[in-house]
Curated annotation (Swiss-Prot):
This is Oxidoreductase dmxR7. InterPro entries: NAD(P)-bd_dom, NAD(P)-bd_dom_sf. Belongs to the avfA family. The lineage of its organism: Eukaryota, Fungi, Dikarya, Ascomycota, Pezizomycotina. Keywords: Monooxygenase, Oxidoreductase. Pfam families: NAD_binding_10. The keyword DNA damage does not apply. Oxidoreductase; part of the gene cluster that mediates the biosynthesis of the dimeric xanthones cryptosporioptides. The pathway begins with the synthesis of atrochrysone thioester by the polyketide synthase dmx-nrPKS. The atrochrysone carboxyl ACP thioesterase dmxR1 then breaks the thioester bond and releases the atrochrysone carboxylic acid from dmx-nrPKS. Atrochrysone carboxylic acid is decarboxylated by the decarboxylase dmxR15, and oxidized by the anthrone oxygenase dmxR16 to yield emodin. Emodin is then reduced to emodin hydroquinone by the oxidoreductase dmxR7. PANTHER family: FLAVIN REDUCTASE-RELATED, OXIDOREDUCTASE MDPK. Its EC number is 1.-.-.-. It is an enzyme of class 1 (oxidoreductase). One of its GO terms (molecular function) is monooxygenase activity. The keyword Oxidoreductase applies. The gene is dmxR7.
Amino acid sequence: MATYAILGSTGNCGSAIIQNLLKSPNNKVHAYCRNQTKLQRLIPEVVDNKNVQIFQGSIYDVELLADCVRGTKAVFLVVTTNDNVPGCRVSRDCATSVIQALQKIKAEASPGLKLPKLVLLSSATIDDHLARHMPGWFRPIMLAAASHVYEDLRLTEVFLRSHADWVSSIFIKPAGLSVDVSRGHKLTLDEEESFISYLDLSAGMIEAAADDESRYDGRNVGVELSSRGELRCVLSWD
């Protein structure tokens, strides 16, 4: 049985990850959130579920974070914000606290302890390779509209990569996201999909985290629809 920690459990992506994980009885969930009541309202399946442990607290509570991520296979960093304000550092603060928690766990453990992978929700918009097919007029608009949020993500990636010698990270980079049904997904290192649902995105994140061959460690990973033509006929960049 594999255990996964989700930081940002009440957000669209975090709740979708939990819903997908709970489809299998072989998964255990450590759900980290600021408001347990809100989480239970959003995802009733977590109530009295023996495969779910809820941790209520701040992303700055390193002790509680250590309890949450200890013994897990992967940690999903999906704490996000839509507020594009100067000095935004929601993602960096979360990543910093997680690294501090892992340092604490490592210091207290016996040699050879296997630490969890970190799976960061980032964006294809800040990736020159994945975003290379975006229209030349569109990407600058997106970068300007969420400039501080994107800078926070960019610096978070730099920070996590600086710890790559002892902690593996995967950088998940979708394009547009929507609240929609699951339509099937596939992982890619070369493309981005114009729009994909949170359910499909989260399924892709779980697949990358569960990969025992470590093919996605340290990589920028896109998640696209398994049948690419379904939405592109309606939501084309052209």
